[in-house]
Amino acid sequence: MQLGLCTISNTELPVERVLQVAADVGYEGVEVWGKDHLGDGDADACASIRQTAGELGLDVAVYGSYLTVGTDGFADAYERELTIADRLGADLIRVWPGDCEYGDHTPSEFESAVTDLRTLAERAAERGLGVTIEKHKGRLSNTTEGARRLVDAVDHPDCGLNWQPLFVLSERELLAEAETLAPRSNNVHLQAPAERDGDERTLLSNAYFDVGTVLERFESAGYDGYVEVEFVSQDRPYEDTVRRDHEYLRSLVEKADHD
């Protein structure tokens, strides 16, 4: 497993500064936020980010797009979003599945999302890119079952899940979900409150669930992708926070590798 930092972890700093912090701390890659840090995604902006990351020794692991499959706007938007990911030199493009939660969907809404994901995965593969599906409330991937069914229905080697903990789940439920979804995941986001269903992020070492046990589930499944810090505690200076999270995750990854 490799450790990455999502540039959305600090939306106030210029993206170049976030990249510098990531490199200084020791992260191996970054996920580039697809809004303010990228502007309109023109060739010059992407080239600048790609060059800066390369000079700092960072992979652009993911382009964090807001492309939504299964919606009317997908057909007109996906080629442009793939071009941005390509310009950045990203390994994966993050996408959003539908605009309703699993269980609230109609069969046609689910099938539309699956069809779009297959199309996207095929076109992405032509560019040497993979697709990662955001697991998030308000989307078809909000539940374990919804996320599992989506990935299984798409059934494409270059399309997986961007797993992240949803704080409505208990620690036991999170661990069970991780065991089910780790084999279907190609990216991981980590963030946490100190208490279940909390709003304020804390250091990952203070998470209400055992982050190390979660990573063990992924290690057992043979996961070898990025584990990315997404949102961080606001109680300390930014660089100190992402450094602490990196040190903690590094210790857990090394332990998992040796167990």
Which sequence ranges carry the predicted segments?
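N-terminal pre-domain/capping segments
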Residues: 1-86, 90, 156, 160, ...
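Conserved beta-strand positions
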Residues: 5, 32, 63, 95, ...
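Acidic-and-aromatic substrate-binding clefts and catalytic sites of carbohydrate-active enzymes
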Residues: 8-15, 32-45, 67-76, 100-105, ...
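Acidic/histidine-rich catalytic cores of soluble enzymes
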Residues: 16, 29, 119-208
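Alpha-helical scaffolding segments of alpha/beta enzyme cores, especially the outer helices
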Residues: 17-21, 44-51, 55, 76-87, ...
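A structural motif
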Residues: 27, 90, 185, 223-224
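Active-site groove signature of glycoside hydrolases
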Residues: 85-105, 127-137, 228
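Conserved active-site loop/cleft motifs that coordinate metal ions or position small ligands
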Residues: 187, 224-232
